[in-house]
């Protein structure tokens, strides 16, 4: 009984050590903001700027000028000529 308990403890320690090596925070990526002391993440924002596209084509108009997709209505995209309807 004592031998199997010792083996289980050793196995658990080995698993903790092995799994602990996978969870590593890379240095320099999370820093503390000097002004307010909050933690900040210096990695790029991975949130996509793409908008979901509906299969239903809207007949509503679009804004005329844009710099990026978020400047246009939800059913429009930003092109080199300005906002334009998706598939239209």
UniProtKB/Swiss-Prot annotation:
Q: What is known of its domains?
A: The cysteine framework is IX (C-C-C-C-C-C).
Propeptide residue intervals: 28-58
Q: Which residues carry this modification: Asparagine amide?
A: 87
List residues, modification 4-carboxyglutamate. 68, 73
Signal peptide start-end = 1-27
Which tissues does it occur in?
Expressed by the venom duct. All different gamma-carboxyalted forms are mostly present in part 2, part 3 and part 4 of the venom duct. They are also found in part 1 (proximal part near the venom bulb) and part 5, but in lower quantity.
Does this UniProt record's set of keywords contain Disulfide bond? Answer: yes
As for family, the record states: Belongs to the conotoxin P superfamily.
Is Secreted given among the entry's keywords?
A: yes
UniProt-recorded name of the protein? Conotoxin tx9a
Q: Which GO terms describe its molecular function?
A: toxin activity
In which organism is this protein found?
Conus textile
* Chain's role: Neurotoxin. In vivo, intracranial injection into mice of 10 pmol/g of the peptide induces running in circles and hyperactivity. At higher doses (50 pmol/g), the mice exhibit running and climbing symptoms for close to one hour. Between 130 and 150 pmol/g, characteristic 'spasmodic' symptomatology is elicited. A hand clap would make mice jump high and start running rapidly. When exposed to a loud hand clap, or if the cage cover were dropped, the mice lose motor control and exhibit seizure-like symptoms from which they eventually recover.
